[in-house]
Regions:
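Conserved "HGTGT" condensation-loop signature of ketosynthase/thiolase-family condensing enzymes
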Residues: 1-82
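Short pre-catalytic strand/loop immediately N-terminal to key active-site residues, enriched for Gly-Thr
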Residues: 81-91
């Protein structure tokens, strides 16, 4: 079997859950997301440069976070040629991101 076109889910990770004004208040969204993405890639044994697309679920991105998945992917070491998709389905964003990614397979 030719593995050059093989598409797989390798792992998943989520950002920490904090409280309003808590210890994570000064951490930018894309920095936290990049930590989660790097952790998922490390768990799956995949180098960041091998990623073709990143799908991230996030609620309420605005301003500099309008294309949060792209910022996360680049901060985690993905190639500039890779693509990224941010899914905003309010409370269901994470689950919808998984569903959307699976439909692309």
């Amino acid at each position: 079997m030719d593995n050059s076109n093989k598409i797989v889910f390798v792992s998943g990770a989520r950002t920490p859950v904090g409280r309003f004004g808590g210890s994570l208040a000064g951490t930018e969204n894309h920095v936290m997301g990049a930590h989660a993405l790097r952790a998922a890639l490390e768990r799956g044994g995949v180098p960041a440069g091998a990623v073709d697309e990143v799908v991230i679920g996030c609620v309420g991105q605005v301003g500099g976070d309008a294309f949060l998945a792209r910022r996360i992917a680049l901060a985690a070491g993905a190639r500039p040629e890779s693509t990224a998709v941010t899914v905003n389905r309010l409370c269901g964003s994470g689950v919808e991101a998984i569903r959307s990614a699976s439909l692309e397979l």
